[in-house]
Amino acid sequence: THIVLVNGFARRYESTGEECYRKSVANFWNMLMHSHAYVNGTSSGPRPNVTTETSLTAEHWGEPCHLCNTLTKGIAESCVTHNTQRLNASLFSWTGNPCYADVYMNMFYNAVLPVQSRSTGAYVYHLPLGSPRHKAYMADNDFKCCSGSCAEAFAKLNNGIYYHDDSAVYVNLYVPSKVHWADKKVGLEQAGGFPVEPIVDFTVSVRRPVDFVLNLFIPAWTDGAVVYVNGEKQEMSVRPSSFLKLSRRWADGDRVRIEFRYAFRLQSMPDKENMLAVFYGPMLLAFETRDEVILKGNKDEILAGLSFADSESGRFVLKNGEREFRLRPLFDVDK
């Protein structure tokens, strides 16, 4: 409910220009992301330090940065995820700040897509993130708040891919798609297997050569990317959490390729250093096990045990001590 109110502040700022409402939205976002968000950018959980009738339900924000004891089976309400994405989109459209694009991308792949079953289309009310946990889907005849929020979220998956101003187009998400920029009479087609594959291709369509800037988002999780224009490698500085600017006169059929550098990484809970999440590139990985996952060694030793199960399946292996775990992207888990 609170996030919906703050989204109302955003609409009021856009309608009236009242600065206090813009500040309210930005301050709320900072509090949410820096003190209450899980590794995939979403939030909400129980309040185990409080004893009330509703304290153990998964629709609270508790003490700031106290998250490790909230990983019950029901956390990360889908309404919270959807409405946080609306905040991310508003703040980016006002500022162009890459930090909002970073959170939007993280949530898109690791909080939004995982709430829907790939086989049935059903949605979860809460997205479990602890260990061991499984997804519990709503029934076809359920009519909960998240039933509507999820339907809206999946009807608007294309909303955050592209932005533009008078002279530039911004690519915030890497999703196979086409966009037509009416003011410049420019078409842009995007292709590739991102996020499973690190290569994305673009093709420009114009009636006559036109000048504009193509801004490609470089997420915080990558330590490098290589860009080619019409097959020629571009010698450009690439910084995480920024936009790589390609400014030129574009002709019909011009091609751009970006190749991201993927790596495994571990992210800790803010209040418990040894409670970890495993990522590969942009993807949050889930363990394929019914048991509590307890790992041995320090972070470097755990990272050294991670590898691909094979090059095509999108599955991963973690060899840790005498045990071997299988992992896959959270959005690919159906149960």
Residue ranges and their predicted role:
Residues 1-4, 42-77, 120-143:
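Carbohydrate-binding/catalytic loop surfaces
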Residues 222-247, 266-271:
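Solvent-exposed beta-strand/loop surfaces of large extracellular or lumenal domains
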Residues 1-14, 72-92, 150-157, 198-200:
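Well-ordered alpha-helical segments within folded domains of soluble proteins
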Residues 210-219:
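Surface-exposed beta-strand/loop patches in extracellular or lumenal glycoproteins
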Residues 223, 252-253:
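Short, flexible surface segments
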Residues 13-26, 33, 92-102, 208:
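Structural helix-adjacent loops and short alpha-helical linkers that scaffold large soluble proteins
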Residues 25, 98-200, 205, 239, ...:
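C-terminal beta-rich recognition modules with glycine/proline-rich loops and embedded aromatic residues
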Residues 30-34, 113:
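Amphipathic alpha-helical segments of tetratricopeptide repeats
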